[in-house]
């Protein structure tokens, strides 16, 4: 995988310190670079995004991507944004078609 080629590790279903799981985690040694959660339903999406942000925060991630296949903007004008901001988690909603390119760009920016 592209991560290992440049010194990062990708871990599927990373177990968190409190027993939850993060769908995909990008790590570099002991540093937690990026938590990625895949959401395939628009039902309760705001609450699910908040839960994902709490999981990421509690496990030491400050960057979270929500991979979301729908065209609507689940966080636009949302009460959830304020709570996530207070956690100090940088969150981005990413379309599945953009994930690989965005991961490559993020990791390249961290290496060079």
PLM features: what roles do these ranges have?
Residues 1-31, 41-46:
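Active-site metal-binding core of divalent-cation-utilizing nuclease and nuclease-like domains
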Residues 1-2, 27-29, 62, 74-112:
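Non-catalytic C-terminal interaction segments of nucleic acid-processing enzymes
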Residues 14, 39, 95-97:
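Residues at the C-termini of beta-strands that transition into short coil/loop
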Residues 17, 70-71, 98:
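Conserved beta-strand edge residues that scaffold enzyme active sites
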Residues 18, 23, 59-62, 112:
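Acidic-enriched, low-complexity/disordered segments with a strong bias for Aspartate over Glutamate
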Residues 23-25, 48-51, 106-108:
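Surface-exposed beta-strand edges and their flanking turn/coil or helix-capping segments
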Residues 33-35:
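Hydrophobic "anchor" residues on beta-strands that sit immediately upstream
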Residues 38-93:
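Catalytic cores of nucleic-acid endonucleases
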């Amino acid at each position: 995988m592209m991560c290992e080629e440049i010194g990062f590790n990708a871990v599927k279903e990373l177990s968190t310190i409190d027993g939850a799981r993060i769908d995909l985690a990008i790590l570099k040694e002991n540093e937690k670079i990026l938590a990625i959660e895949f959401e395939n339903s628009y039902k309760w999406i705001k609450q699910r995004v908040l839960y994902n942000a709490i999981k990421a925060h509690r496990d030491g991630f400050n960057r979270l991507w929500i991979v979301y296949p729908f065209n609507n903007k689940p966080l636009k004008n949302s009460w959830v944004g304020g709570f996530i901001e207070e956690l100090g988690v940088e969150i981005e909603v990413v379309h599945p078609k953009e994930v690989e390119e965005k991961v490559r760009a993020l990791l390249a920016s961290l290496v060079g």
